[in-house]
Amino acid sequence: RPKPQQFFGLM
């Protein structure tokens, strides 16, 4: 599963 930083990067 993606890391928190990667999740925010998609936004």
Swiss-Prot record:
* Principal location: secreted
Q: Name one GO cellular component term.
A: synapse
| UniProt KW Nucleotide-binding keyword | no
Please list the residues that carry the modification Methionine amide. M11
Q: Where does this one sit in the cell?
A: Secreted
InterPro entries in alphabetical order:
Tachy_Neuro_lke_CS, Tachykinin_dom
Q: Which residues cross the membrane?
A: none
Keywords, comma-separated and alphabetical:
Amidation, Neuropeptide, Neurotransmitter, Secreted
Q: Name one GO biological process term.
A: tachykinin receptor signaling pathway
In chain numbering, the residues marked as site (Cleavage) are: P2, K3, Q6, F7, F8, G9, L10
Family of the protein in this entry? Belongs to the tachykinin family.
What does the function comment of this entry state? Tachykinins are active peptides which excite neurons, evoke behavioral responses, are potent vasodilators and secretagogues, and contract (directly or indirectly) many smooth muscles.
Name used for this protein in its record = Substance P
> What organism is recorded for this protein?
Cavia porcellus (Guinea pig)
